[in-house]
């Protein structure tokens, strides 16, 4: 026990959109906070996986790139006098400690140790890696297979692009290539009959003249010929499509934070269960954003930011333990 360590009102775990905004808004509530981020940069999935993806549900913007949202959140945070952010920081352990009859969380990291009165988990899906393209349970590796859009988008100019997947990211990337006038030669291939995306973005696929192949599975990837062979799951009809690049959007495989104290938090579908005030079942621990499970809650940047405000509002109004 070290009584000389600094005590923060709030420790924010994770530097995605929700975490950055929580760090900023903590100043508004006169709470001194520290944000811990494992990577060397802020932004989470929007910066890591889809920096050029357009967002259509962010206030004051008809459309805005996710990376630009993150940049604005970071700039807003930098204007706060008491902003405290630690990058490249691994949390080694979190334990309960009692200092002067007050229960605190002791954080031990690869850089330093400190105390916190409250915790906000803004860790998203944890550390994540993209789900690889597999054929017959064998992962396919190729320089022509991409899992995120290369920022040097000139390499895609007027190229033949195949997008694999049927969720938001796959549908939005397919539209992105056409709408940004990068290339008009785009096809999207999905193993199911229906997309898992907004009706607005799905309608854009037809408006953008994107070739759509629903209910198809991948049966062959030929790197030398640059062709992808697909088979309809019902008719078993095969078709070979040429490509220059294949963009795989099969989602992510996450590795949650493995800390004994945090492992005691109730979870559903791998996410922290919260109440209306973002509280978990563990005293003084809150969770926001993609890290949480709440009935009918959309996982969007604006939702994560709103949840940051809700958690901090509750913390500021309830200074005592709950």
UniProtKB/Swiss-Prot annotation:
EC numbers, comma separated: 1.18.1.2
Enzyme class: oxidoreductase
Cofactor: FAD
Cofactor note: Binds 1 FAD per subunit.
A Pfam family annotated for this UniProt entry: Pyr_redox_2
InterPro entries (alphabetical): FAD/NAD-bd_sf (IPR036188), FAD/NAD-binding_dom (IPR023753), Fd--NADP_Rdtase_type_2 (IPR022890), Ferredoxin-NADP_redctase_2 (IPR050097)
Catalysed reactions, semicolon-separated: 2 reduced [2Fe-2S]-[ferredoxin] + NADP(+) + H(+) = 2 oxidized [2Fe-2S]-[ferredoxin] + NADPH
Binding site for FAD: 37, 45, 50, 91, 128, 290
Transmembrane segments: none
Any GO MF annotation of the entry: flavin adenine dinucleotide binding
Keywords for the protein's UniProt record, in alphabetical order: FAD, Flavoprotein, NADP, Oxidoreductase
Protein family (similarity comment): Belongs to the ferredoxin--NADP reductase type 2 family.
PANTHER family: THIOREDOXIN REDUCTASE 1-RELATED-RELATED
Record note on quaternary structure: Homodimer.
Protein name: Ferredoxin--NADP reductase
Organism lineage string: Bacteria, Bacillati, Mycoplasmatota, Mycoplasmoidales, Mycoplasmoidaceae
